[in-house]
């Protein structure tokens, strides 16, 4: 009798079972999910502001310590590894976040699948390094690709810990990890660039950031995997993740085809100008999307059976993002010259027209990318794959169409095609089922266009009036002046005004809640 009881306790010890349950249960989040979403968003926005400052400093410092060809060389390799990196996650982080109930055995098996597949990808990447160097006609690519292949394994071992923290809406912890890891990577890159390590500073930044994220995720999460087990019911999760992974691969392949084509046919220096112009605009926008993304997917996943609340939550987030992205893109277009020269320096003047065209791309791409919130929160992996495939083919076609004219031809073609072909396709697929319809997405997009028009006109007018002043003065005065004056114009329209008041109310409420504690 005693032996049987001991065996039962060993198989299912209550303390262990209770401890494991803490990592997976989400029922306690539903009672105040709105407050958690706003509070989490507030914390994450603060972290992104800190990360934005870091990235601004990194862009300014590294652009002066390194040459365009250094960024171009690493950009060549990242164009390839970014596509392979998708499979290190296999879409299994979203599978863990989106699932209503999940077990220790399931997450354990997902962890080992991530690690095993990541190791395989690292070996494959290392094997392909010499061929990639031949493709680019640059022998330096081999060593860079070998070094960056290490990040596959690091990322694979981080996926499930990050997913569990997101599932539990532990946004402050995620924010601290994100900023701290980025700061360490940036610091190392600056030291190495200053010491003359050239492009290796950028490689070290990638590896250091990923390694720090791994260490901090493991320490913060507290979750530890067991050995793999059979019959855990993990097959549906892997199936869902496979669709997401394929969709992400198609998306990454199309998104990085420009870097691959430009690196192959035009070399490292033109690609360096292109990637810096792209990153200078895309990174701040990504840091705007990231806090909303981190908060909204878990929230929408919990609301997937409440159509009215789901649609309302999504469209409010859409309106807030449209307001910010349109205003930011318009301001950047009017300030293209002073922005590039102040942040990157005079030797990057060739990036000014590229940066200006990327602001046109920014009108449509972020607001098509966030359709992934719909697919991931509703478990529509097949639809996401269809979406990414159709949009990816259109994007690659735009790159090929503009390649003859070099970097400026590629980005101009992308801007036009994204707006008139890609966006309609994406909105049709996203809205053909579920609470959010295609008409909702178009209404959200078109009703917020006055934000872009108002801010651009007012900022451009300010630049024209102060054009005789230095670039720094134009940046410091014309940007805020154009944003304030433009806001006064677009607030005359009901939808932008509603989005602005909603966002302001949420921020005000979060501030009051935090300072009341």
Q: In which residue ranges do the predicted regions lie?
A:
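Transmembrane alpha-helical segments of multi-pass transport proteins
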Residues: 3, 10-22, 124, 390-394, ...
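Helix-loop junctions and terminal segments of transmembrane helices
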Residues: 87-104, 166-167, 277, 281-325, ...
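N-terminal membrane topogenesis motif
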Residues: 1-56, 94-97, 101-112, 139-142, ...
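Alpha-helical transmembrane segments of multi-pass membrane transport and lipid-handling proteins
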Residues: 2-25, 56, 112-137, 142-146, ...
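Short runs within selected transmembrane alpha-helices of multi-pass transporters and secretion channels
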Residues: 28, 51-55, 59, 78-81, ...
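Interhelical loop/hinge segments that connect adjacent transmembrane helices in multipass membrane
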Residues: 14, 18-33, 172, 215-260, ...
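Transmembrane helical elements of multi-pass membrane transporters/channels
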Residues: 40-55, 202-205, 209, 213, ...
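Interfacial/gating helices of multi-pass transporter permease domains
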Residues: 57-85, 142-143, 235-240, 244, ...
């Amino acid at each position: 009798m005693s032996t049987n009881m001991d065996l039962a306790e060993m198989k299912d010890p209550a303390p262990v079972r209770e401890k494991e349950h803490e990592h997976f249960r989400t029922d306690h989040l539903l009672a105040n999910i709105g407050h958690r979403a706003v509070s989490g968003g507030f914390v994450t926005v603060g972290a992104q502001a800190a990360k934005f400052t870091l990235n601004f400093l990194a862009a300014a410092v590294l652009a002066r310590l390194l040459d365009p060809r250094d960024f171009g060389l690493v950009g060549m390799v990242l164009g390839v590894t970014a596509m392979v990196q998708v499979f290190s996650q296999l879409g299994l982080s979203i599978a863990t976040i989106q699932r209503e109930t999940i077990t220790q055995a399931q997450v354990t098996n997902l962890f080992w699948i991530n690690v095993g597949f990541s190791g395989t990808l690292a070996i494959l990447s290392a094997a392909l390094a010499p061929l990639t160097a031949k493709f680019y006609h640059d022998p330096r690519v081999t060593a860079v690709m070998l070094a960056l292949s290490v990040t596959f394994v690091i990322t694979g071992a981080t996926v499930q810990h990050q997913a569990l923290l997101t599932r539990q809406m532990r946004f402050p912890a995620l924010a601290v990890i994100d900023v701290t890891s980025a700061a360490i990577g940036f610091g190392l890159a600056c030291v190495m660039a200053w010491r003359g390590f050239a492009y290796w500073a950028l490689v070290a930044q990638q590896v250091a950031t990923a390694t720090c994220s791994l260490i901090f995720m493991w320490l913060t999460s507290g979750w530890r995997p067991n050995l793999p087990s059979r019959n855990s019911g993990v097959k549906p999760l892997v199936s869902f993740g496979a669709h997401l992974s394929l969709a992400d691969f198609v998306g990454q392949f199309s998104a990085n085809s420009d870097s691959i084509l430009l690196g192959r046919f035009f070399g490292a220096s033109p690609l360096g100008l292109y990637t810096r112009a792209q990153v200078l605009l895309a990174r701040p926008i990504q840091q705007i999307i990231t806090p909303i993304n981190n908060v909204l997917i878990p929230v929408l996943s919990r609301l997937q059976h409440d159509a009215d609340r789901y649609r309302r939550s999504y469209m409010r987030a859409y309106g807030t993002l449209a307001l910010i992205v349109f205003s930011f893109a318009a301001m950047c277009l009017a300030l293209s010259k002073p922005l590039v020269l102040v942040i990157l320096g005079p030797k990057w003047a060739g990036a000014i027209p590229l940066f200006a065209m990327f602001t046109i791309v920014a009108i449509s791409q972020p607001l098509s990318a966030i359709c992934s919130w719909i697919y991931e929160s509703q478990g529509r992996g097949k639809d996401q794959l269809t979406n990414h495939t159709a949009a990816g083919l259109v994007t690659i076609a735009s790159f090929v169409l503009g390649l003859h004219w070099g970097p400026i031809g590629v980005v101009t073609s992308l801007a036009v095609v994204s707006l008139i072909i890609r966006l309609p396709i994406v909105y049709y697929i996203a809205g053909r089922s579920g609470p959010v319809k295609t008409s909702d997405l178009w209404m959200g997009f078109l009703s917020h266009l006055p934000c872009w028009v108002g801010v651009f006109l007012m900022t451009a007018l300010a630049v024209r009036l102060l054009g005789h002043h230095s670039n720094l003065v134009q940046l410091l005065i014309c940007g805020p002046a154009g944003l304030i004056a433009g806001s006064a114009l677009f607030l005359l329209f009901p939808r932008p005004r509603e989005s602005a008041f909603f966002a302001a109310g949420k921020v005000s409420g979060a501030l009051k809640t935090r300072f009341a504690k």
